[in-house]
Structures are given as structure tokens and as C-alpha cells.
Design a protein with these regions (language model features):
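Noncatalytic, beta-rich nucleic-acid-contacting surfaces in large DNA/RNA-processing enzymes
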Residues: 1-257
Length: 257
């Protein structure tokens, strides 16, 4: 993942995501969860901040000592909806239910409800000994993240699938790419990306052969056998008949067969 070799990996294969992975150099599962949540409009701007703090190039800003524990796992960057709710509870004395109302108001951009929630957040923080200026500053920080943010469980589920596909590609590259390419038979642009990956991985490609290939891409040792159904204007039904004939009467010997 740290090298950006993520073609075919769930959630991680776009060019922008590859660049983010190379810069982040994830070394724990939590990094993948964070990146899945951050790689969205709004929070995306904070990927460089997360990376710099992770690598010790920048000091994390925890906004207030009372919420340091909430923001410490994400290097001071507000990423998840749960963090927004926890901040409201710790700083302003919101109940869990009230914090969820705040989250919904931000997510749905309901200005009337949000204005009431903002006032409640600031007043609650002031009652707990926080200056009004600090409360306003923190509210302005959490507002844009709540609009676009994932909840952590959602991001974790995506990250788990991404990690599982990365594992399969790392330890079973030929099998993984064969399955991935078989799902993209008509997508020539995507197939081209996979062929470049095969070159990088030093996996040979068996050209289309009526006596060796099948409808889908098939992995055998260090060779990937081309999918006959991926040939333009050749469908699964025609290939199925060819394979059936080959298995019944042996290899084709001439065009007249």
C-alpha cells in the first residue's frame, strides 16, 4: 500500500488515493480507516495535515486539552462523525441523543436547527468553563467535517475490505488479477491497467488461443491465460460452445474444425 500499487483494490485504486497512500505510508489498520474517511470532499484537504503529523513533521493541534484524547488517534484532525458527537458531549455537556441531533443537523445542513444547536453548543461550553471565543472556534472546526464525514464503523468496514483485497493481491497476485479482469471483460481501459500491473509483477500473458484459453481469464502458475470472451464481438455463449467442442473431441487442428 505504501508504494501505491493498488490497481484493483477496493476504495484504494484511484490515482489520487494512490498518491495519498504513498505520502501517508500507512503502517497500521487505523491509517487505512482514516484515509477512507478523509478521501472525500471537504476532509480531503486535511490529508496533508494528517500525514505531516503522523510523520512528526507538524505538531498536532488538539484544539483544547479536554478533547485531546478524542483527537489523539487522528493526529488532531477531526475525521469521524463520532468525534463530533464526543466533542459536543465533553465540551458542552450534550447527552448522546443531543449529540446525535447535532450530527444530523450538520449532515443535512438544516440551517434553522443548526443555528439552535450552535447556540446550545456554545452556551454549554461556556457553562463548563470554556471561553465563548474558544467554543465558537471549535464549532467552526467541527461543522465542515460533520457535513461530509463518515461514521467510523462505515469507514472501518470499507477499510477491512480494502485490506483483504490488498492481502489477496499481495499473496495471490495472479489469481486476484485474473478474477478482477474477468469482472471487467468489456472495459478495455481497465484491462489495460491490469496488463501494466502484470508487467510489473512479471506475470506472463498467454495470448488468445482456441486450444488453451477459456471464457474468463485463468491463472496457471506464473502465466495468465487470456479470456476469449474479452475479444471484441466474441461472447460467452460462443466461447462455451468452443470449449465444449474442444473437451469433447480434442484440440482444434485447423480452421475447418
Amino acid at each position: 500500500l505504501s508504494f501505491g500499487y493498488t490497481v484493483g483494490l477496493f476504495q484504494l485504486e484511484s490515482a489520487g488515493m494512490r498518491d495519498a497512500l504513498v505520502n501517508m505510508k500507512p503502517n497500521k489498520f487505523e491509517d487505512i480507516i482514516a484515509l477512507v474517511a478523509l478521501y472525500r470532499p471537504g476532509p480531503m484537504a486535511n490529508i496533508p495535515v494528517y500525514n505531516k503529523c503522523k510523520h512528526g513533521e507538524k505538531q498536532p493541534d488538539y484544539l483544547h486539552p479536554k478533547i485531546k484524547k478524542i483527537l489523539e488517534p487522528t493526529y488532531g484532525v477531526i475525521i469521524y462523525q463520532e468525534q463530533v458527537m464526543q466533542i459536543a458531549q465533553i465540551l458542552s455537556g450534550f447527552t448522546a441523543g443531543e449529540a446525535d441531533i447535532l450530527r444530523k443537523a450538520m449532515g443535512k445542513k438544516k440551517s434553522a436547527i443548526l443555528e439552535k444547536q450552535k447556540e446550545k453548543f456554545i452556551n454549554g461550553a461556556v457553562e463548563k468553563g470554556i471561553t465563548k471565543e474558544t467554543a465558537i472556534f471549535i464549532f467552526r472546526k467541527i461543522e465542515p467535517f460533520a457535513q461530509y464525514g463518515f461514521n467510523k464503523s462505515h469507514a472501518a468496514a470499507y477499510a477491512m475490505i480494502a485490506y483483504q483485497t490488498a492481502y489477496l493481491k499481495t499473496y495471490y497476485p495472479n489469481e486476484f488479477i485474473a478474477a478482477s479482469m474477468s469482472n471487467e471483460l468489456s472495459n478495455t481501459e481497465k484491462l489495460s491497467e491490469f496488463f501494466e500491473e502484470l508487467k510489473r509483477l512479471n506475470i506472463k500473458v498467454q495470448r488468445p488461443c482456441i486450444n488453451k484459453c477459456f471464457a474468463d481469464f485463468v491463472p496457471k502458475e506464473n502465466t495468465l491465460y487470456y479470456a476469449l470472451a474479452a475479444i471484441k464481438n466474441v461472447g460467452y455463449e460462443a466461447v462455451a460452445q468452443l470449449v465444449q467442442e474442444r473437451e469433447k473431441n480434442g484440440k482444434f487442428k485447423s480452421i475447418s474444425d
